[in-house]
Amino acid sequence: LDKLVPKLIRRVKNQGFNAVIIDPIYKVITGDENNASEMGAFCNQFDKICTETGCSTIYCHHHSKGAQGAKRAMDRASGSGVFARDPDAQLDMIQLETSEEFINENADNLSATGWRLECSLREFPNFKPVNFWFDYPIHKIDTTGSLNKVYAEGDTKNNLSKSGKRSQTPDSRK
């Protein structure tokens, strides 16, 4: 990214763009993704793009390995916690666990998958999660509410819905 940023700024500056999108960032990452100091310097390059071009910088990143459902949206990013603390806004898409039977009953297409969009916003209240179907190549908001009680892998609510034995989560008992 260190070499890309000056070129990017020259090309984008004074062009009237609203945003620069870098997808995915792992292809331009400089330094160790798990090192906070190195990722802080890396993320400062995004600020430089914003400052010098007047554009927002949007980047796409991936989740860490393993089940993500028990984590907050801001804690799912792979690598250093800088990826949770640096952005002014994070949008996180997570796939929901849907059975074949559920898909048959609720989706328009048998190849569709259920997803949830969550956010973490620095200056504003977070919006409510948005559920949607991904039916290649289109994302469609779930207007029926069928995905409201479906959860991502690792979410404790998912385990409760499967067992049917308890209606409380550890958080609700506090």
Kindly label every feature range from the protein language model.
Residues 17, 32, 67-70, 80, ...:
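Intrinsically disordered, low-complexity regions
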Residues 2-3, 36-38, 73, 97-98, ...:
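General structural signal for secondary-structure boundaries
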Residues 122-174:
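Conserved alpha/beta core segments of nucleic-acid transaction machinery
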Residues 4, 83, 115, 171-172:
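Alpha-helical structural motif
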Residues 19, 36-143:
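Phosphate-binding/switch region of NTP-binding enzymes
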Residues 1-37, 41, 48:
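Conserved inter-motif catalytic segment of the P-loop NTP-binding fold
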